[in-house]
């Protein structure tokens, strides 16, 4: 069984992330969505909230396939976390050339540290290319409509975080 490891902050999960996850299930039988925990950062959503939003979003997008996806936390090197979960593929989504430049550097370093783990780049669909979790958080915080960029569960969670 091929296991893929999809690391990110997912703060929050966006339609772009969901798009990449749908594609990832075409190249791996199992996908581990790995939420990075970084002590110096203050995410909008806690790990538990992010994990639940991922589960709810995927249940809607992939009915019947969520058993092939596991959500975990990690706070170490991506390749070490992937290896600990038995993954042989790293999944990375690409929106544009800027992402490609950065991700190629990361893939090279990961390959040097873990030649047994391959990085797979999955292109974002046209509709999800402009979406970033950072922009979603900023727009939502200012009362903007982010419904086109996030799954319904995330929209509801963002709305509940907005000050009245």
Swiss-Prot record:
Domain of life: Bacteria
UniProt: ATP binding residues: 9-10, 17, 93-95, 103, 128-134
Keyword flag Transmembrane helix: no
Pfam families (alphabetical): CTP_transf_like
Keyword Nucleotide-binding applies: yes
Catalytic activity field: (R)-4'-phosphopantetheine + ATP + H(+) = 3'-dephospho-CoA + diphosphate
Subcellular location: Cytoplasm
Keywords: ATP-binding, Coenzyme A biosynthesis, Cytoplasm, Magnesium, Nucleotide-binding, Nucleotidyltransferase, Transferase
Predominant location: cytoplasm
Cofactor(s) named in the record: Mg(2+)
Biochemical pathway: Cofactor biosynthesis; coenzyme A biosynthesis; CoA from (R)-pantothenate: step 4/5
Family (UniProt): Belongs to the bacterial CoaD family.
Subunit structure comment from the entry: Homohexamer.
Protein name per its UniProtKB record: Phosphopantetheine adenylyltransferase
Native source species: Rhizobium etli (strain CIAT 652)
Highest classification ranks of the organism: Bacteria, Pseudomonadati, Pseudomonadota, Alphaproteobacteria, Hyphomicrobiales
């Amino acid at each position: 069984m091929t296991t893929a490891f999809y690391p990110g902050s997912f703060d929050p999960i966006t339609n772009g992330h969901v798009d990449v996850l749908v594609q990832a299930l075409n190249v791996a039988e199992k996908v581990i969505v790995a939420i990075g925990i970084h002590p110096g950062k203050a995410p909008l959503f806690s790990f538990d909230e992010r994990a639940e939003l991922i589960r709810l979003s995927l249940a809607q997008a992939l009915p019947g396939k969520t058993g092939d996806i596991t959500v975990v936390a990690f706070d170490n090197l991506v390749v070490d976390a992937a290896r600990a979960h038995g993954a042989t593929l790293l999944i990375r989504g690409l929106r544009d050339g800027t992402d490609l430049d950065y991700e190629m550097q990361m893939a090279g370093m990961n390959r040097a540290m873990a030649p047994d783990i391959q990085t797979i780049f999955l292109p974002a669909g046209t509709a999800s290319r402009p979406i970033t979790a950072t922009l979603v958080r900023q727009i939502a915080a200012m009362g903007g409509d982010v419904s086109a960029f996030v799954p319904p569960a995330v929209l509801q969670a963002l709305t509940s975080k907005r000050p009245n």
